[in-house]
Structures are given as C-alpha cells and as structure tokens.
A protein has these predicted regions:
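Beta-rich interaction/scaffold domains
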Residues: 1-50
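Extended amphipathic ligand-handling, pore-lining, and cofactor/metal-binding catalytic surfaces
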Residues: 45-283, 288-355
Length: 355
C-alpha cells in the first residue's frame, strides 16, 4: 500500500513523507517478507531489483545557478546505471560544451522520481520544481534541452508547462528534440534522423563485434531497433527512421516499437519482415535515449511477451541477442544534443521572450 501511494504521476504535500515511510517499511522487512510484497503496482523488484549504484548519478538539483541555466528535461528512469550513463552522458556533454551555463536536470515522470527517491534517497526535480528553482536563483536566460526523441506528447506537455513561467525570465527557449522536425509523411527524413541512424547503427555493429554492417549482413545478422511508439501524430517519426535506414542502404536494420504504433512497427510485423529478408540471427537494441524499463523488460525480459521471447518463439531464427544500451551514451548522439542547444542559443527554437 505504501508503494501504491507513491506510484502516482502527481506530486503532493505528502510525497516526501510517503517516500520516506515506504523506504523505512521496506528496510524493516526480512528477506523472506520482501519476497511477499504485493500491491497494484508493488512487487519485490520495486525496491529489490539491482539496477546499479545510485551514488554514481548526479541529480543536478543544486542552487547557485547564476544567470544562465541549461535545463535538461528527460522522461527519466529508475534504472540507476542507465540514468547515469544515458541521461548523465547527455548532461555531461552539454556542461562540457557550455561551461558558462549551469546545467540542471528535471524529469517529467513523477512516478519515476518517487521510485528513485523512495529506494535510493536521491531527489530529482520535476519540471515545476526545476523552474521554481530557476526563478528563486534569479536565472535570466533559460534554455531547455529535452532529451525526448521527437515532437510527441511529452514535448507538447513540456511546452505547456514552460509557458506559464515565460514571464519569470528575460528569455526562455526550448531546443529541438533528438530527431528534429517530424515532417509530413513517412518519406520525410532530415539531417538529425540521418545522424542518429548512423550513430546507433555504428554502435550496434561495434557492440556486436562486427567490422561493418555489411559483414553482419553476410553473417546473416539483422539489427532491430525498438522504440516506444505513440498514438500521437508524431508516430510517423518511426516510419521515417525506417525510411532513413533504407536510404542509407542499411538493408539489415529494422525499426519496431513497443506500442506497435505505427502498425508496421509492431513486434509480429517486424518478425515477419526480418524473416522474409532471410536473416537467421537477430540483435535487439533500444531506439530510446535511455535503456530503462522498456529495454530491460519489454525488449530483453524473460516474460513470454518480451520481444526477445517473441522472436525466439517464432522459431524462425537461430540466435537472438540483446544490447541494453541507450542512445544517450553514444558520443555522436550527445554531440547532436549539443548542436540543438547551440541552435537554441542562437535563437532557433521555441522562443518565449518575456513581455
């Protein structure tokens, strides 16, 4: 019940105390009792799963910001190692590129913020908290760099949240998400999508110990990059990424989504596409900034509905491997965020100048 109480998307006056109580109650249990924990959203993994050392992650929630702030906004993840490497990787790259700006962090998922706070006593600002912190610190110029993949629902909600604060600063600019403008249909691609396609493919090939993508193809290996998927109109972005892969000549690279939107990206349809192309080995990798819950469970988990299990159950392939690595730890992707932030600094972004 304590876990269920904090498994919510809204922060309230009781959140901090509820997180503390949940942690104390968990710590008071024996190992045998911990295995029996249950609730609508509670299970032993909520506190007990080893996701890495939280102390290696910097929540970037300090004061003494100065007049120029670069706020990096992410959905978030409760997987400690992924948070430090993927989200932290982007944040560190931005701080290195812009030493005269103070980099701070905000997550949009309060459920994740509460999870991390209750389990690890690490406090991460939500967007409102981060904006209030900026105001109280006298920030004048605020640039917000979302780590979101696209102009989807999360990006729209961020713009709405920031809009109510625009009069608190001399200027507020929201930079582009990773894949840039959406475009009108599945055939529309851009430099951002090309850069990400090249970066994730090169890293996947390297992690699989192949000399090249062609060498992987000759070995009968296909790469499947699994995104989240969305019912938002921005879902065409995933189709565009497949178009981008095809345009680059990456014939053994396929795009899928957990949600199966767009339809051709659903797991069963991707399985059929890979099978029809004749590949016998498959490497699954997340097309996500963070290798969090979706990568570890929906993609690489042992449950029968995970992508790994579905590919194995198809009986069409000899070998299924997974790479649990987010986009945020890839140097070329980090530098793309640096470029988007630079464009925002130069006035190319969603601009909200105070009246």
């Amino acid at each position: 019940a304590l876990i269920d109480a904090i498994y919510v998307q809204e922060r309230n006056d009781n959140t901090d105390e509820q997180c503390k109580e949940a942690k104390e109650a968990w710590d008071a249990l024996t190992d045998a009792q911990k295995e029996l924990v249950e609730g609508e959203n509670a299970d032993p993994d909520y506190f007990g799963r080893d996701t890495g050392d939280a102390s290696k992650d910097d929540p970037l929630n300090g004061d003494e910001i100065g007049e120029n702030e670069l706020l990096v906004v992410s959905f978030g993840t409760s997987f400690n190692d992924s948070r430090a490497e993927d989200i932290g990787g982007v944040e560190k790259a931005l701080q290195a590129a812009y030493p005269d700006w103070s980099v701070r962090r905000a997550f949009t998922a309060q459920i994740i913020i509460n999870h991390v706070q209750a389990r690890d006593d690490e406090k991460i600002d939500n967007v409102d908290q981060a904006l209030e912190r900026a105001v109280s610190n006298g920030v004048k110029k605020l640039i917000i760099q979302p780590t979101h993949l696209m102009h989807g629902a999360e990006y729209d909600e961020l713009k709405e949240a920031v809009d109510s604060y625009k009069d608190k600063f001399e200027s507020v600019t929201i930079a582009e998400p990773l894949l840039g403008e959406v475009g009108s249909d599945a055939t529309v691609i851009n430099e951002d999508k090309q850069a990400v396609a090249e970066a994730i493919t090169a890293q996947a090939v390297k992690s699989a110990n192949y000399d090249s993508l062609d060498a992987a193809a000759e070995d009968g290996t296909a790469f499947v990059f699994m995104g989240h998927g969305t019912s938002h109109t921005a879902k065409v972005t995933y189709s565009q990424m497949q178009t981008q892969m095809d345009t680059l000549g990456y014939k053994n690279v396929f795009i899928g989504t957990v949600e199966g939107e767009p339809e051709e990206t659903a797991c069963e349809n991707v399985i059929e596409a890979v099978k029809a192309a004749g590949y016998k080995k498959v490497i699954l990798r997340p097309l996500m900034v963070v290798a969090g819950d979706h990568a570890n469970n929906d993609m690489a988990g042992e449950d029968e509905d995970s992508w790994k299990s579905q590919f194995e159950a198809s009986g069409a392939f000899d070998e299924i491997d997974t790479q649990i690595e987010g986009l945020g730890r890839i140097d070329a992707v980090e530098q793309l965020y640096v470029q988007h932030t630079k464009a925002a600094m130069d006035g190319n972004g969603v601009q909200d100048d105070a009246e």
